């Protein structure tokens, strides 16, 4: 059973159903959590996600699964930790789980240092908590965001703990920054990332423009999902595909007017 939101793109709902899930769309996160709680209490369902308000994170076993991202990054970097590791964040399951992975590798002596964790978030509940020196994140003002998977006004204690313990920061990102990062990564690296997952690269670009990194530092941005799950979001920065002209001169005109290509 998967409770999703009615606003989630149809492509994502199709993928969920294709893998065999019973998918139900709810109008709001709160209504989803209420139904989950009833299923847990009345029928003994086993929850893999959170179902309380304010959010406290997901099933601990699921959060621990994110530790393997730290293991993989450490292996790829020849068993050294990056200086900074950036993660798209909402309720911070990934942020906290990855941080736990690094602390365990460090405790075992497999890496000598720990990364500074960065949370990339549309509305900034963790950034707000750090700025105000809060012990627990408070709800912040929210709105719409193309990064809907992480567009939450709530942060969690776990996420704030990961940032505090690693001397990290929260970075507020915008739709404009997301589209810029999505376009750059697709065209320069051949990676088409979903808007929520490209939040990490967006934060890196933002911090880099503010000269927050040393040129010699190793920065890792975790990308969590393919853009093929939400291709409609990219229409905001892509021109409509033109119809095929009847003649070659017409084709040259279309290429010039629509794509800025002068080939004649």
Predicted regions and their residues:
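Active-site/ligand-binding loops adjacent to catalytic centers
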Residues: 33-54, 62, 104-192, 236-264
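Catalytic phosphate/nucleotide-handling subdomain of diverse soluble enzymes
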Residues: 201-263
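Short glycine/serine/threonine-rich phosphate/pyrophosphate-binding segments
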Residues: 1, 9-13, 91-98, 126-129, ...
């Amino acid at each position: 059973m998967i409770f999703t939101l009615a606003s989630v793109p149809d492509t994502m709902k199709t993928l969920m159903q294709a893998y065999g899930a019973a998918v139900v769309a709810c109008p709001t996160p709160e209504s989803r959590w209420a139904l989950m709680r009833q299923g847990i209490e009345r029928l003994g369902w086993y929850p893999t996600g959170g179902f309380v308000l304010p959010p406290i994170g997901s099933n601990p076993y699921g959060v621990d699964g994110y530790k393997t991202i730290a293991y993989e990054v450490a292996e790829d970097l020849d068993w050294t930790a990056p200086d900074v590791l950036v993660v798209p964040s909402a309720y911070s399951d990934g942020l906290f789980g990855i941080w736990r992975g690094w602390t365990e590798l460090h405790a075992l002596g497999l890496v000598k240092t720990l990364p500074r964790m960065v949370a990339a978030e549309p509305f900034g509940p963790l950034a707000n908590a750090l700025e105000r020196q809060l012990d627990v994140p408070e709800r912040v003002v929210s709105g719409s965001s193309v990064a809907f998977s992480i567009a939450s006004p709530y942060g969690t204690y776990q996420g704030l703990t990961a940032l505090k313990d690693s001397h990290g920061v929260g970075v507020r990102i915008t739709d404009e920054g997301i589209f810029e990062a999505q376009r750059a990564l697709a065209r320069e690296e051949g990676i088409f990332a979903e808007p929520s997952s490209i939040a990490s690269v967006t934060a890196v670009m933002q911090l880099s423009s503010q000269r927050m990194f040393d040129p010699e530092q190793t920065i890792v941005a975790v990308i969590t999902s393919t853009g093929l799950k939400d291709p409609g979001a990219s229409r905001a920065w892509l021109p409509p595909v033109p119809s095929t002209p009847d003649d070659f001169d017409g084709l040259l005109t279309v290429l010039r007017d629509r794509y800025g290509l002068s080939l004649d």
